[in-house]
């Protein structure tokens, strides 16, 4: 026994340690390498300083996806952010798959785990880190709001808000804080593969709402963090989008210049920051402008700290908006310990109809939403609120990366385009929104953002137990009404890259006749598969909206009606640059 145990111990010592993905090696001699199993369209869906997103086809399954190629050369000091995003997406995808396998469903209209961007595959090349995700429509929630000036309160704002509440409830139940919930990160599913369903055209319940709410997908987990497993200081970072950040994040401003003792005195924030951002987004959907934005970033941050947001006098006294104002008040609570949770908000009168089943099972825990006082103004040094849609355009931004464990920091500067739009300045004494909107002047100030399945998914309403979960198997032919979520069975391993190193990173195809490949090096990758590619596919356009100022999700989309405009802002983030340049082949 001793000899055997000793031999096993020696063998274990000789075995190479499993290296975390990505390897970040140009040669990667120790890792198994494969030729790329995807072909991409010639045109990119969007590109930016750090990454390019393209539509791609898996040459084995012929399904269409979005391929995000993150440039190693530009993210070398931020690789841990990409690793964090990848780890979270993979963990969430596995959890979703497990829930669908166990048929864990409720009878509510929205299931939170059905509305999160799905990660399908991932791999590394000499130049890029590549993520394969689901394909989404061109145009995000931001563009939808701006094109329509605002959304309909009763059919769109309530349903979109309810869907996002279900998403946050799921994420928070898994201990995950998103930290960058905003309109640009809310996408719409694009159903392009054979097994994906179309809306049935029927409403669930006895009230009408926009069925596109079933297509909502929350994306960009570049800033997301696990509340219970993150480093002690990772949730003391000044990160996010200025228009959407909560007061507890504002307190972290300048954390990069703080001493370890000062950092230690900061309170760790958590899931309530997403609830605050939800309030901002709900307000933005209803009015077409954000509640706290002022002339300068400092004024905006002061208004956030004091919960001083613009309230239109006419809208405030409109009975139609009564529950809306109460809902955003629940979100705009300065003390995060008192701020409502996503689970509580499901029972709020503003959106409770979308969760009638689960709410009926939790009547004893129904919170009281009637205690809030009348909305009041808070005096601050900011004399003007800026009524505007938060701009998607970008400006020169200084990014400070903070190594909070080591007490050191470094800064770098990212340059991007600038687009000017009119500002809407509103004096606090004006009583009419319409009068305020006539006072257009100056230039839109920029705000910051840091960043960036198939058969199954069935649910039997007829065999649900008293807890609202299904007792039937996934073989039932019934599906959740109007839900457009589908979960792929695990694809065959030979059709995936699964984190390997690819010798041919990008095989391009025009997805059409004739069969053309953009470069000779790529043609060798798909030579034996090229006859399998469906040459009848026509080019499609889609987009995964995100931001161009980070190493995670950075690209733009434009259309004729609304040129793409991205957020911009200054931020500090905890990054351990332990990999070093020597591990990267640039």
UniProtKB/Swiss-Prot annotation:
Record-listed ATP binding positions: 45-53, 68
Keyword Cytoplasm: yes
GO biological processes: cellular response to oxidative stress; signal transduction
Subcellular localization: Cytoplasm; Nucleus
Gene Ontology molecular functions: ATP binding; calcium/calmodulin-dependent protein kinase activity; calmodulin binding; protein kinase activity; protein serine kinase activity; protein serine/threonine kinase activity
SUPFAM superfamilies: Protein kinase-like (PK-like) (SSF56112)
Keywords (A to Z) from UniProt: ATP-binding, Cytoplasm, Kinase, Nucleotide-binding, Nucleus, Phosphoprotein, Serine/threonine-protein kinase, Transferase
Annotated InterPro entries: Kinase-like_dom_sf (IPR011009), Prot_kinase_dom (IPR000719), Protein_kinase_ATP_BS (IPR017441), Ser/Thr_kinase_AS (IPR008271)
PANTHER family for this protein: SERINE/THREONINE-PROTEIN KINASE
Subunit field text: Interacts with RIM11.
Protein name listed in UniProt: Serine/threonine-protein kinase TDA1
Gene from which this protein is expressed: TDA1
């Amino acid at each position: 026994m001793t000899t055997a145990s000793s031999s096993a111990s020696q063998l274990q010592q000789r075995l190479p340690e499993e290296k975390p993905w990505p390897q970040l090696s140009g040669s990667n001699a120790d890792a198994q390498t494969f030729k790329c199993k995807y072909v991409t369209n010639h045109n990119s869906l969007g590109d930016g300083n750090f990454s390019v997103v393209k539509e791609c086809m898996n040459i084995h399954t012929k399904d269409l996806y979005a391929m995000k190629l993150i440039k190693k050369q530009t993210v070398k000091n931020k690789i841990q952010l990409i690793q964090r995003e990848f780890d979270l997406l993979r963990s969430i995808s596995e959890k979703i798959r497990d829930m669908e396998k166990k048929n864990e469903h409720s009878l509510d209209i929205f299931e939170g785990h059905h509305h999160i961007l799905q990660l399908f595959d991932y791999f590394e090349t000499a130049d890029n880190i590549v993520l394969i995700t689901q394909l989404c429509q061109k145009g995000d929630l931001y563009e939808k709001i701006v094109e329509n000036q605002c959304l309909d309160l009763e059919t769109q704002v309530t349903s979109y808000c309810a869907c996002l509440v279900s998403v946050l409830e799921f994420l928070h139940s898994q201990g995950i804080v998103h930290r960058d919930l905003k309109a640009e990160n809310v996408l719409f599913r694009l159903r392009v593969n054979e097994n994906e369903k179309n809306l049935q055209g029927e409403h669930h319940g006895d009230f009408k709402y926009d069925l596109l709410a079933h297509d909502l997908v929350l994306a960009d987990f570049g800033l997301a963090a696990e509340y219970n497993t993150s480093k002690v200081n990772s949730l003391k970072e000044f990160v996010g989008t200025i228009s959407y950040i909560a007061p507890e994040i504002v307190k972290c401003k300048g954390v990069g210049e703080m001493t370890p003792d000062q950092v230690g005195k900061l309170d760790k924030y958590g899931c309530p920051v997403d609830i605050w951002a939800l309030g901002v987004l709900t307000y933005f959907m209803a009015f077409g402008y954000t509640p706290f934005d002022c002339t300068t970033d400092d004024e905006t941050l002061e208004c956030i700290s004091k919960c001083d947001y613009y309230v239109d006098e006419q809208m405030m006294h409109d009975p139609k908006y009564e529950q809306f104002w109460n809902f955003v008040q629940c979100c705009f609570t300065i003390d995060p310990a008192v701020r409502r949770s996503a689970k509580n908000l499901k029972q709020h009168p503003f959106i409770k109809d979308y969760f009638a089943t689960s709410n009926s099972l939790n009547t004893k825990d129904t919170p009281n939403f009637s205690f809030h006082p009348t909305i009041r103004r808070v005096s601050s040094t900011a004399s003007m609120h800026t009524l505007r849609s938060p701009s998607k355009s970008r400006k020169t931004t200084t990014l400070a990366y903070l190594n909070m464990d080591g007490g050191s920091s470094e800064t770098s500067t990212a340059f991007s385009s600038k687009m000017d739009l009119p500002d809407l300045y509103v004096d606090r004494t004006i009583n009419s929104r319409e009068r305020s909107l006539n006072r257009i002047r100056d230039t839109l100030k920029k705000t910051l953002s840091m960043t960036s399945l198939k058969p199954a998914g069935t649910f039997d309403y007829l065999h649900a137990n008293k807890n609202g979960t299904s007792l039937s198997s996934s073989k039932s032919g019934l599906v959740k009404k109007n839900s457009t979520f589908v979960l792929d069975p695990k694809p065959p391993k030979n059709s995936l890259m699964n984190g390997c190193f690819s010798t041919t990173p990008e095989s391009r195809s025009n997805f059409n006749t004739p069969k053309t490949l953009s470069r000779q090096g790529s043609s060798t990758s798909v030579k034996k598969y090229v006859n399998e590619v469906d040459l009848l596919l026509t080019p499609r356009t889609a987009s995964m909206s995100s931001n161009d100022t980070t190493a995670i999700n950075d690209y733009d989309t434009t259309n004729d009606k609304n040129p793409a405009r991205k957020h911009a802002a200054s931020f500090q983030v905890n990054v351990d640059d332990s990999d070093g340049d020597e591990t990267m082949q640039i």
